[in-house]
Amino acid sequence: MGSKTPGNHRRGPNESSPHPAIDAINPPKQAAASRLVHSSLEGESEGGEDEDDDKPGADLKAVGQIGNNGQKRNKRRKKKKKNTKELEILQTTPPRVALANIFRSQRYPEAEIVKYSTDNDNLQRTTAEELRHISVLNAMDDEFLNDYRKAAEVHRQVRQYVQTIIKPGIALSQLAEEIEDGVRALTNHQGLETGDALKAGMAFPTGLCLNNIAAHWTPNPGAKEVILKYDDVLKIDFGVHVNGRIVDSAFTIAFNPVYDNLLAAVKDATNAGLKEAGIDARIAHISETIQNVMESYEVELNQKVIPVKAVRNITGHNVLHYKIHGDKQVPFVKTQTNQRMEEGDVFAIETFGSTGKAYLDDATGIYGYGYDENASTAGLHHSSAKSLLKTIKENFGTLVFSRRYLERLGVQRYHLGMRSLVTNGIVQSYAPLVDVPGSYVAQFEHTVLLRPNCKEVISRGDDY
């Protein structure tokens, strides 16, 4: 167990791991911090010709020759223009300066690069048998990687600021607003004009889940305000996208040191999953590794020792273009599957650990909605539903959105239309997921890109 610290000390993603062996194998890479600036030197301007050179007869008198008055003319010196340097633009606190104004070259920093094992025979097989596929993948690298790295840098800068303001007494609605305002400011897309939110911004509603609420809870308009308390365990899960390239990352904050081992268990389990991820990695092996690491921990609550359990019915997942959930899953418990990770995959490796029964049920309320582009609209007759669907397609596409996002666009009286869309299976609704009352759940998550010759933990920062 970690050493106790003075009261009100925040325990979160910056805590050192009680499993240094894992961190030694997969150390966090120092990511770009919120004060990172890029500047460039303007090139030295070409010196202009002397204005007298264009006068008639100017070419008759060479420099240094004797003039008509018998005096030797002095050679004229061209004035050198001094180099000028662009003013460095720093990120503000809270972060509200668009990254495009800081990174003038529009090139964003790479994240943690992990080379594949040199004794992996499949690496040579991939290079020999799929050369054409790799060349196609490499042709996409510049745009693909830069979009992902920009989204990741936005996520890092926003969450680093947010960690400084998360304290007992803050309202969760204020916290959600700080996160979402920061993302929209740094991507320079407020999402108020039609289609603007599809260019860059929030990939899904900010998840702020307390204690036994594991996932899919966000403040909703008109709901009772929720205030963070000292004994709460808060999970912060938000996504950033740039041109549909989604970075999904989450962390947990606790102030009371009794939860130290719970957070350490989940953080170590996530890092173990990231370490095992790679081209041709067996998902069954990754799942078993995650469970073994997480369930090696115990937590003492109310003078009772409780084992940390891996949550059984929620999983990590691959991420697709404009879709937060793909068709591949990474459970946190031992599973029977022959599925493997593949080159070019993007995975959100996340883990949830619980002091409860580690099985989640749907709670009352709605977290958000997602449009199913493959659903038939043949049975849709209500004009309000058709109008709402048009708004959803134009502003969110297949990205998950919440009621707050609709009302931010000025959409009113949408409840009947939304009910019709959900009933017809055109839009899917997501409920909060909860463990038993009195239990505590923690979460950590990173997005990893499985590139041809390495994996890039794109959301890695110096915080977690």
Swiss-Prot record:
Biological processes annotated in GO: proteolysis
EC id: 3.4.11.18
Amino acids binding a divalent metal cation 2: D248, H317, E350, E445
Database matches in Gene3D superfamilies: Creatinase/methionine aminopeptidase superfamily (3.90.230.10), Winged helix-like DNA-binding domain superfamily/Winged helix DNA-binding domain (1.10.10.10)
A GO molecular-function descriptor: metalloaminopeptidase activity
Bias-annotated ranges (Acidic residues): 43-54
Binding-site residues, substrate: H216, H325
Pfam families: Peptidase_M24 (PF00557)
One GO CC term on file: cytoplasm
PROSITE patterns: MAP_2 (PS01202)
Cellular location(s): Cytoplasm
Cofactor(s) listed: Co(2+); Zn(2+); Mn(2+); Fe(2+)
Region annotation (Disordered) ranges: 1-86
Keyword field: Aminopeptidase, Cytoplasm, Hydrolase, Metal-binding, Protease
Binding site for a divalent metal cation 1: D237, D248, E445
Matching InterPro entries: Creatinase/aminopeptidase-like, Met_Aminopeptidase_Type2, Pept_M24, Pept_M24_MAP, Pept_M24A_MAP2, Pept_M24A_MAP2_BS, WH-like_DNA-bd_sf, WH_DNA-bd_sf
Amino acid composition bias (Basic residues), ranges on this chain: 72-83
Major subcellular site: cytoplasm
Textual note on the cofactor: Binds 2 divalent metal cations per subunit. Has a high-affinity and a low affinity metal-binding site. The true nature of the physiological cofactor is under debate. The enzyme is active with cobalt, zinc, manganese or divalent iron ions. Most likely, methionine aminopeptidases function as mononuclear Fe(2+)-metalloproteases under physiological conditions, and the catalytically relevant metal-binding site has been assigned to the histidine-containing high-affinity site.
Reactions mediated catalytically: Release of N-terminal amino acids, preferentially methionine, from peptides and arylamides
Function, in words: Cotranslationally removes the N-terminal methionine from nascent proteins. The N-terminal methionine is often cleaved when the second residue in the primary sequence is small and uncharged (Met-Ala-, Cys, Gly, Pro, Ser, Thr, or Val).
Family: Belongs to the peptidase M24A family. Methionine aminopeptidase eukaryotic type 2 subfamily.
Protein name per the record: Methionine aminopeptidase 2
Organism: Ajellomyces capsulatus (strain NAm1 / WU24)
